[in-house]
Amino acid sequence: MKPEDTIDYFLKVAWQSVANKYNQIASGYGITQALGYMLINIHEEGTAVSQIACLMGVKSTSLSRTLKNMEELGLIYRQADELDKRSVKIYLTPFGKEKKQVAKDVVRKFNEYLNEHIGEEERLRLAAVLNKINKLTLDYDPGYEE
């Protein structure tokens, strides 16, 4: 089977193109696509590290270097949760809020561009197919034999 015969090939190629474009644009603002995504998902009332890890698809411990970098850049600060002192929440600094707005604007403009070139019916069909692929992936059991 050739890579072009698999669905995941096209998913990866399309996402890689999107991520590369976001990185190219984000670098002009001194951030990366991943940092922009994290900034967009940090809420005014703070966001738990575990929530961010889930969104990024990584373990909480894997985020420590990225969060440290974001602190050093002055984008975020950490604070123990008032209700559960064992839990740490991430908050945006004023500079982080500025960069979050930039990231949101970049995403909005890029999606406006895509929507100008992809019709409503095509977009809805794509979303439906991607949702179906996601569900099938979650349901898939390869049934390995030992």
Residue ranges of predicted features:
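C-terminal regulatory/oligomerization modules of transcriptional regulators
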Residues: 1, 121-146
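Amphipathic alpha-helical interaction segments
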Residues: 9, 13, 37, 125-128, ...
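Charged, amphipathic alpha-helical coiled-coil/dimerization segments
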Residues: 19, 69-128
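Short, locally clustered residues in the helix-turn-helix/winged-helix DNA-binding domain
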Residues: 15, 40-44, 104, 131
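N-terminal helix-turn-helix DNA-binding core of bacterial DNA-binding proteins
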Residues: 20-62
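N-terminal leader segment of winged-helix/HTH proteins
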Residues: 1-29
